Regions:
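Short peripheral tails and domain-boundary helices/loops at the edges of structured domains
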Residues: 75-94, 145-169, 257
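SH3/SH3-like beta-barrel fold
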Residues: 30-34, 59-61, 97-100, 127-129, ...
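Structural detector for short beta-strands of small beta-barrel domains
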Residues: 10-27, 75-94, 563-577, 628-629
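Short boundary/loop segments of OB/S1/cold-shock single-stranded nucleic-acid-binding domains
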Residues: 1-18, 44-53, 58-83, 127-128, ...
Length: 645
């Protein structure tokens, strides 16, 4: 059998204390996430002792022989995640109550009012906690300011920003330091690098991109090809001791909400100095790969370079040039695309996953209201650029391994790892697809290829999307780590992130470490990189959650125009409280509450992920096509209510 990720064993003692972070699931209970412990601790709300979502706490853990989960109680609140919230106000004479609108905060706050003070129920406010209260006294907050009207774009997006504690403005010290950066590249700096300015280099990015952190080049020689993958040399502009670096460390990633980007770096760096804009010299870190005439890799070189991009393509521009075989660099684009396809085929045959992207995009009007929802169409040019970025990341990781072997030393480094899925998750997937007549091979070395075969088999069938979603949820989460472990999803022995330093701090760390180790520097202290890998992984997850909430908000806003309308839909989730369905035409997901299904009493089957009518025996399961009617939307809660039609 395949080797699955092992769960750590529970401690043997009946009672002990641990430190962790509160994940408040609902009004009844929360889980405490313990970093060094594989199993979360369940805490019933009455034992939280005033702790709320995100707080760091110390808990006393105890075992219930009759219960499956470890349970416990909070004995100390070590650190509050935040003291500020966005919410609404229930106004009364002489006092008011502030109700946070964060979905994971289940406490309201007493507000003292001045005599003339009035609050509107149709507005959202920012409040600061002044007293956390106790068992005898309600917590108290003061109102800082009005954020805006409920349902307006700025109000709702700011709610998401506060809910996920996202950064907004850069500190003045960071801006001052950035303003002092020199835009001119000195001849001395150029002399330290491989000069590639005469080579035809170009970028390929989305239409609305402002920061271009990667470029490609191709040179055809007599019996081989040289492909250059050129990445913005972000680490050249600030060192580890600067305030720019401290802020980038803290942010760790750029965040892409539907209507805005919250960048990791100030605009002068992200959109100007580091951006590989056309017709200007730019400092880069390059991976130059030598291919033979059969498109197999012969050798590669990694080092600091200077380039001069000759053209800024959009993905559409580049695709049109490939399709029509005309325009600037069309021969190079076609050859790059052909080589990328061969690399991709080889990667998939080696066990790399071929999950399809279902990225949702919105067209917004001048007031940032959604007027169209559509699925991002992945063209050959998207896949081509992605393939070269994957290859560069892989080769950089392999370079570090080769340095270690040569020097016979361990060099701490930042890897991107993806663990094997847990056996229980794979078995759940196997049981789920069995009802559709499919199976997968879980023997060691066969799971990835078997999953790719499954994806081909289900393509175009009604259960297609639901099985793919289930399969993705069965996988472990890719993280940053100093451990030299494989990337299961890509089927790479070693992998890192090198190609997006404008928007990811781990890539900045990789550039620095790579440069030091290639210049025969001593191995770095591992502790800092352990801390930063953990922090970067955490911030990546937080950014993803915020991005998803902004999508849900815009979906609810868009569907508010279609209340009473009927649509074809596919069941995308089944729970004990209802059925989630994705509307085919708009890609928006809503909930059909079981309480609204009046024709029978429906029973939830968690193993088969379906509900069944007790009397009529009707079955509703993942992947099933149904017809729904839009009943209501709640823009504030970011939800869509549906009923069967």
């Amino acid at each position: 059998m395949m080797k699955f990720k092992n769960k750590k064993k529970k401690k043997n003692s009946r009672s002990y204390t641990l430190k962790g972070t509160v994940d408040h699931v609902n009004k009844k209970y929360a889980f405490i996430e313990i970093d060094e412990f594989s199993e979360d601790i369940k805490i019933r709300s009455r034992f939280l002792k005033g702790a709320i979502h995100g707080d760091k706490v110390e808990v006393k853990v105890f075992h219930h022989l009759s219960r499956k989960n470890l349970e416990g109680e909070v004995i100390k609140i070590i650190e509050r995640k935040t003291t500020e919230f966005i919410g609404t106000i229930q106004d009364s004479k002489g006092f008011a109550f502030f109700i946070p609108k964060n979905k994971k905060v289940f406490v309201d706050f007493f507000v003292k009012k001045r005599k003339s003070e009035k609050f509107s129920k149709n507005k959202k406010y920012l409040a600061k906690v002044v007293d956390w209260g106790n068992s005898l006294k309600k917590p108290e907050a003061k109102i800082i300011k009005c954020i805006g009207n409920i349902g307006e774009n700025e109000t709702e997006i700011n709610s998401i920003i506060y809910d996920f504690d996202l950064p907004t403005e850069f500190p003045s010290e960071v801006i001052k330091e950035t303003d002092l950066l020199n835009e001119r590249i000195s001849e001395k700096e150029i002399s330290k690098r491989k000069d590639l300015r005469s080579i035809d280099t170009f970028t390929i990015d989305p239409d609305d991109a402002k920061d271009f952190d990667d470029a490609l080049s191709l040179e055809k020689k007599d019996n081989h090809y040289l492909i250059g993958i050129h990445i913005a040399d972000v680490s050249h502009f600030f060192n580890i001791r600067t305030t720019i670096n401290k802020e980038a460390e803290k942010r760790a990633t750029s965040i892409y909400l539907v209507d805005r980007t919250i960048p990791m770096l100030p605009e002068k760096l992200s959109n100007n100095l580091c951006s590989l804009k056309p017709n200007v010299d730019r400092l880069t870190y390059s991976v130059i790969i030598k291919f033979d005439i059969d498109f197999s890799i012969i050798d590669y070189w990694i080092g600091r370079t200077v380039i001069h991009s000759k053209k800024r393509f959009t993905y559409d521009d580049a695709q049109e040039s490939i399709n029509n075989k005309n325009g600037l660099f069309h021969e190079k684009l076609n050859l790059l695309n052909s080589i990328a396809k061969k690399i991709r085929d080889k990667r998939f045959s080696s066990g790399s996953f071929n999950f399809r992207s279902n990225e949702i995009k919105f067209k917004l009007d001048k007031n940032k209201k959604p007027v169209e929802v559509y699925k991002k169409n992945r063209k050959d040019t998207h896949k081509m650029v992605e393939e070269y970025m994957l290859l560069a990341n892989k080769l950089v990781a392999e370079k570090i391994i080769s340095i270690e072997k040569k020097e016979k030393k361990t060099y701490p480094f930042v890897y991107r790892i993806h663990e094997d899925p847990e056996e229980s998750k794979v078995n759940e997937l196997k049981n789920y697809i069995k009802q559709f007549g499919y199976t997968i091979n879980t023997n060691e070395g066969n799971l990835a290829n078997s999953l790719n075969g499954l994806m081909k088999e289900i393509k175009g069938k009604p259960e297609d999307r639901s099985i793919e979603k289930f399969a993705i949820r069965s996988m472990s989460k890719a993280i940053y780590s100093t451990k030299k472990e494989k990337h299961f999803g890509l089927s790479f022995r070693h992998y890192t992130h090198f190609t997006s330093p404008i928007r990811r701090f781990p890539d900045v760390m990789v550039h620095r470490l790579l440069s030091d180790y290639m210049n025969e520097s001593k191995p770095k202290e591992k502790t800092y990189y352990d801390i930063m890998c953990k922090h970067s992984s955490k911030m990546e997850i937080n950014a993803s959650k915020a991005e998803r909430e902004s999508i849900k908000y815009k979906q609810a806003e868009f569907m508010s125009m279609f209340i009473g309308k009927k649509f074809e839909a596919v069941i995308s989730g089944v729970t004990e409280w209802g059925v989630y369905a994705e509307i085919v035409e708009t890609l928006c997901e809503g909930l059909i509450k079981i309480s609204s299904m009046k024709d029978d009493h429906y029973v939830f089957d968690s193993e088969k992920m379906r509900i069944t009518g007790r009397n009529n025996k009707k079955i509703f399961r993942l992947g099933q096509s149904i017809r729904v009617k839009v009943i209501d939307t709640d823009i504030e809660k970011r939800t869509i209510d549906l009923e069967l039609s």
